[in-house]
């Protein structure tokens, strides 16, 4: 009974937190110029080498449907979420580090690319990607039957005994994500999901305090199981 109650409390608290963040993001977006999907597509396909901005399609695939397991699929991800991530790859000033870094704090290729992007670039390419359809025929899927039950348990109910909330509370039961803040994980590469959870856990990805707290209470086996399960959601 106590475990069931804890699960409800955690899920309810996270849902409220998600709603607050979403509302804040929408409010902050008010008054900004409307993003241009056509310009975003041009940058996505061609890049801008004069500023060190590589063509996004090289790593993230046609229409944001990546076929490279370590590179995320970005098709139909929330616009606000994508803009925030691009910002987080950049350092706020010369004395600080980006809040999104690779293993052991190393800067990723995205840090160099984001440094060459303007605010308009970020908004345009994010808007373009948010409108792209997911290619479900080539999307990643669950492949590990032996961890399916464990992954499903964590996704739907979390690990209340360790304070790990249900992933579904913010990423939705079907993995579609939450508009404005939380990404789609359905069809995402499990290797990428697992890597990000480990980066949250280590603190090398420092742009999500709530995710750090969650990942810090998960074992490698937990991470592998729920990452594979999430990939298979539709």
How does the language model describe each region?
Residues 1-15:
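Bacterial N-terminal signal peptides that target proteins for export
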Residues 41, 53-56, 71, 79, ...:
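Disulfide-stabilized extracellular ectodomain repeats and their linkers
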């Amino acid at each position: 009974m106590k475990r069931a109650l804890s699960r409800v409390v955690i899920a309810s608290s996270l849902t409220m937190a998600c709603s607050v963040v979403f509302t804040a993001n929408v409010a902050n977006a008010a008054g900004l110029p409307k993003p241009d999907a056509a310009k975003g597509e041009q940058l996505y396909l061609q890049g801008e080498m004069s500023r060190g901005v590589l063509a996004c399609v090289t790593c993230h695939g046609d229409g944001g449907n990546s076929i490279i397991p370590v590179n995320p699929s970005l098709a139909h991800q929330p616009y606000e979420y994508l803009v925030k991530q691009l910002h987080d790859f950049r350092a706020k000033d010369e004395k600080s580090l980006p809040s999104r870094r690779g293993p052991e704090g190393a800067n990723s290729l995205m840090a160099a690319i984001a440094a060459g992007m303007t605010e308009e670039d970020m908004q345009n390419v994010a808007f373009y990607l948010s409108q792209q359809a997911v290619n479900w025929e080539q999307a990643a899927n669950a492949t590990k039957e032996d961890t399916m039950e464990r992954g499903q348990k964590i996704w739907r109910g979390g690990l209340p005994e360790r304070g790990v909330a249900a992933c579904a509370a913010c990423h939705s039961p079907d993995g579609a994500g939450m508009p404005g803040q939380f990404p789609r994980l359905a069809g995402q590469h499990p290797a990428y999901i697992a890597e990000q959870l480990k980066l949250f856990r280590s603190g090398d990805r420092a742009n999500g305090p709530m995710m750090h707290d969650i990942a810090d209470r998960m074992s490698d086996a937990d991470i592998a199981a729920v990452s594979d399960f999430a990939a298979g959601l539709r």
